[in-house]
Amino acid sequence: AAFKAVTEGVGKEITKINSVVSSALLPLLVFYKLYTPKDGQSITLEVGGKTMNFTRAFFEVRNKVIGHPSCVDVALVSGDRKTILFLESKLTEMFEDTKTENEYGSSYKDLYKQSGIMDALNSRGITIDKEATNLILRSELPQYLEGIKQSISHLIGLVKGPQDNQDQSEYIKAYNDDAKVLIYATIFYDSTHILHNQAIEYENYHSLYSDVIGAHGDAILVDIKKWAGKSNGKTIVIEHNPLTYQKLVQENPDWLDDKVKTFYGL
């Protein structure tokens, strides 16, 4: 069931899941034990300014955005069910998809013209083509623009809430009935120890996320709530810096199977 959830998301990971560079395979291997957890099973992470235990995992959770939903790779529910941690997993995307321009549908244009988002993008030399009908993001230097747009879409989804869908009824219940705090973070596999030539791209996206989403997250949320015309009454917290799988393993040394640790050099 966990495999099905991962491979049927909008990212079409079924075509890549058997690859070592699948960004969906690693979180599946790391968090699948919490999909149908045994009593007492939990994983510990430092998020939201404190150390928290998470006891349940959902994969490829779908939240409302515009047209198509956003699919967040993993949603972890805390032991007291009051917090949901949304994780967007990144493996090699920041090496493969750096561009100076990305184009998206016109439905996003009004949101991205809001001052908080404009300031966030401008902080890293990203601008919007104000004359174009569609949303066009431009950068002075090649950057992983899709990662930033994806994070903003995920934040829209956190504000708007889950897409009504029978196959994610347990996640919908956790979001609607119990959760008081929603935390958004991205989690990286730090590959700089093995992909030395890509170390600059890794560091660039690490700082890009921190500078745009981390530093301006609250202002971005204000813009989203104003644009969407709603606030879900929940506290939304944005991690300022990316998490890493390496740190997760350090904090939970007995969690992963030894074969997975060896496979990924964790």
PLM-predicted stretches and their roles:
Residues 69-77:
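Short acidic loop-to-beta-strand element that houses the catalytic metal-binding Asp/Glu
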Residues 156-266:
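Non-catalytic C-terminal interaction segments of nucleic acid-processing enzymes
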